[in-house]
Amino acid sequence: MLGWIGDIEKATLDNDTFRTVVYTAGHTQLTVMRLRAGEEIGWEAHGHLDQFLRIEEGTAEVDLGRGEDAVDETHPLQDDWAIIVPAGIWHNVRNTGDGDLKLYSLYSPPEHPDGTVHATKAEADAAEAAEHGH
């Protein structure tokens, strides 16, 4: 296939992993994510890429900050809401609902190795620590 074509809503809602890379192109990557009640992505910044996230199911909050040590803004999120996080902006998405939060993310350029599947946040954290030597 010359690109990815599919029902992104179905792919997102059917996902039962913390993070799965669905497709990686030369300049963009599509991932689907599930955060359990109370779970969060974690405070992070991507210095080299922009990130788009869209909520398909659930409620959440996003924190945004100019630096690692300060949250400058917090915004509520719900179904069909989206976030664009520019390169270098610190951010965290937190599931504030009682059920799963289902979302998808576009990274430009790609962030994760093609084919990445992290069943849980703990698995994702361990992989990141190994990759970055923490």
Where are these regions (language model features)?
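Short acidic-glycine-tyrosine-enriched beta hairpin
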Residues: 67-87
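Ligand-binding loop in jelly-roll beta-barrel domains
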Residues: 78-79, 87-113
